Amino acid sequence: MERLNTGWRHSAPVAPIALSEESDTDRTDLFHAAHLAVQALDLKPACRYVLDQLVGCYRGEPVGGRLLVWPSNEFLEQRTGLSERTIRYVVSALLAAGVLSAKDSANGKRFAIRSKQGQIVDAYGLDLSPLLARRREFANKVDVLKDERERRRRLFDE
């Protein structure tokens, strides 16, 4: 495990994440992975709202091999109805949980860098790649939790 240098933000240790070039990731896959992460990690509702909005911001094309999104906190406030402080808290909680990783600019803002033709060549923001990379782990944990709930239900019914 290594620590990624994000500029100014303290980040949790993460394993390098590489997306295969032929991977055709769409929002449906990301929404499914987010749903599994919410269940597996028992994330609070505010985390779920913000994570859903972040996945909804994904444009369908990786930027530099990463699934980057760059919505502002103000945008997330408007879409979720949460305060800016709550948005900051939730984003840091998602980063600490390893659901997201950050690619920070020098000033900490999220934005895309476009070519003269208007194509996105790079971006700074939040990376959804860990969400997709850990999808199998989340699915396994959800299965274990379901089995445990079923076992408890059967014990209670007896």
Residue spans of the language-model regions?
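Short recognition helix of helix-turn-helix/winged-helix DNA-binding domains
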Residues: 1-68
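A short alpha-helical element within helix-turn-helix/winged-helix DNA-binding domains
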Residues: 60, 65-81, 94
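Residues in the recognition helix of alpha-helical DNA-binding motifs
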Residues: 90
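A short, conserved structural fragment
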Residues: 96-105
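Short, Lys/Arg-rich nucleic-acid/phosphate-binding segment
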Residues: 105-114
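Extended alpha-helical scaffolds
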Residues: 132-158
